[in-house]
Curated annotation (Swiss-Prot):
Organism: Homo sapiens
PANTHER family attached to this UniProt entry: CARBONIC ANHYDRASE, CARBONIC ANHYDRASE-RELATED PROTEIN 10
Function: Does not have a catalytic activity.
Tissue: Strong expression in brain and central nervous system.
Family named by the database record: Belongs to the alpha-carbonic anhydrase family.
Gene Ontology BP terms: brain development
Name of protein: Carbonic anhydrase-related protein 10
A matching Pfam family: Carb_anhydrase
Domain Alpha-carbonic anhydrase: 31-301
SUPFAM superfamilies attached to this UniProt entry: Carbonic anhydrase
GO molecular function terms noted in the UniProt entry: carbonate dehydratase activity; hydro-lyase activity; zinc ion binding
InterPro entries: Alpha_CARP_X/XI, CA_dom, CA_dom_sf, Carbonic_anhydrase_a-class
Length: 328
C-alpha cells in the first residue's frame, strides 16, 4: 500500500526532430568528475572527492549550505509569507533539446521560448534554463533529496536563473540570489506524467542512448510537468554538481509525478559513454545528502502549533500525519 501525506506530500506533441549533438550541443556539465567509478580500478572523482581534486570546487567539501539534504518532516516550519508559485509561459508551448550528457538526461529550452517563475520564496523572477533527471538502478533509490531518510525512484529538477540580475545561468550560478531549482520526486506507476511521457516515450528516449546524443522536442507544455498541488517545501542550498556554488534556493513540490516501469527501464539503458566505449548505465546519478547545518526548511502548508525552531520566530512548526501518499 502506498502512502501519501495528509499534508499532501511529498512534494502531445506535434512532432519530434532529430539533430546532431556533436556539432551543436552546448558544453554542459563539463569537468572531470563522476557520481560513481567509471571503470573499476580507474579514478575519476566521485562525490566525496569533488572538493579535493580542484580548488575551484572546494565548496563541495567545506561548504555549510550544500545540497541535497534529508528532509525531516518533524523539523519543517510553516512560513505564512510564502506565496504560491507563478509560472509564466506567455501562453505558448515551448521547444527544447534533450541531451545525454553522460551524467544526466538534460532538456534545454529554445531561447525563443521563455518560461519564467516567481512567487514562493523568490524576490526576483527566474528563467527556466534546464530540466534535469536523476534516477536509480532500482526503484528504492534515485532521488537526490530524501524524505525522512527515504529516497524515491527519481527526481526532476527544473533549474532557473535570476534573469533580472544576471545575463545567463553561468553568471547567476556563482552569484548571490542566482538560482532557483524546483524539485519534483518521481515514482513508478502504471501511468505517466504527460510531460515526462513526451520525454521518455520509446521514439524519443532511444535517440539519446549514448553520451552527446541529442534530440529536439517541440510543442511542450511546461505546466504539465508540475503535480496538482500548490504546496511546497523550500530551503537555501547549493548546486548538486561541481563547483557546488551555494547560490540556489530549492523548492520541493509536495506531490510526486509518475512514470511507467517501462520508462524507468528505458532510462536505465542510457549509457554514460559513447558507442565505441564500454556500456555504463547512467543510473544512480545522484549526490549523497549533505548536512543541514541548522538551516530552516520552510513550507507553505499551514499548521496550528507554534514553534521556535526558526531564527526569526515568525513561523509555525509543522505538525503532520502520514497518510496514503508517498511512503510505503
Amino acid at each position: 500500500m502506498e502512502i501519501v501525506w495528509e499534508v499532501l506530500f511529498l512534494l502531445q506533441a506535434n512532432f519530434i526532430v532529430c539533430i546532431s549533438a556533436q556539432q551543436n550541443s552546448p558544453k554542459i556539465h563539463e569537468g572531470w568528475w563522476a557520481y560513481k567509478e567509471v571503470v573499476q580500478g580507474s579514478f575519476v572523482p566521485v562525490p566525496s572527492f569533488w572538493g579535493l581534486v580542484n580548488s575551484a570546487w572546494n565548496l563541495c567539501s567545506v561548504g555549510k549550505r550544500q545540497s541535497p539534504v534529508n528532509i525531516e518532516t518533524s523539523h519543517m516550519i510553516f512560513d505564512p509569507f510564502l506565496t504560491p508559485l507563478r509560472i509564466n509561459t506567455g501562453g505558448r508551448k515551448v521547444s527544447g533539446t534533450m541531451y545525454n550528457t553522460g551524467r544526466h538526461v538534460s532538456l534545454r529550452l529554445d531561447k525563443e521560448h521563455l518560461v519564467n517563475i516567481s512567487g514562493g520564496p523568490m524576490t526576483y523572477s527566474h528563467r527556466l534554463e534546464e530540466i534535469r533527471l536523476h534516477f536509480g538502478s532500482e526503484d528504492s533509490q534515485g532521488s537526490e533529496h530524501l524524505l525522512n531518510g527515504q529516497a524515491f525512484s527519481g527526481e526532476v529538477q527544473l533549474i532557473h536563473y535570476n534573469h533580472e540580475l544576471y545575463t545567463n545561468v553561468t553568471e547567476a550560478a556563482k552569484s548571490p540570489n542566482g538560482l532557483v531549482v524546483v524539485s519534483i520526486f518521481i515514482k513508478v506507476s502504471d501511468s505517466s506524467n504527460p510531460f515526462l511521457n513526451r520525454m521518455l516515450n520509446r521514439d524519443t528516449i532511444t535517440r539519446i542512448t549514448y553520451k552527446n546524443d541529442a534530440y529536439l522536442l517541440q510543442g511542450l507544455n511546461i505546466e504539465e510537468l508540475y503535480p496538482e498541488t500548490s504546496s511546497f517545501i523550500t530551503y537555501d542550498g547549493s548546486m548538486t554538481i561541481p563547483p557546488c556554488y551555494e547560490t540556489a534556493s530549492w523548492i520541493i513540490m509536495n506531490k510526486p509525478v509518475y512514470i511507467t516501469r517501462m520508462q524507468m527501464h528505458s532510462l536505465r539503458l542510457l549509457s554514460q559513454n559513447q558507442p565505441s566505449q564500454i556500456f555504463l548505465s547512467m543510473s544512480d546519478n545522484f549526490r549523497p545528502v549533505q548536512p543541514l547545518n541548522n538551516r530552516c526548511i520552510r513550507t507553505n502548508i499551514n499548521f496550528s502549533l507554534q514553534g521556535k525552531d526558526c531564527p526569526n520566530n515568525r513561523a509555525q512548526k509543522l505538525q503532520y500525519r502520514v497518510n496514503e501518499w508517498l511512503l510505503k
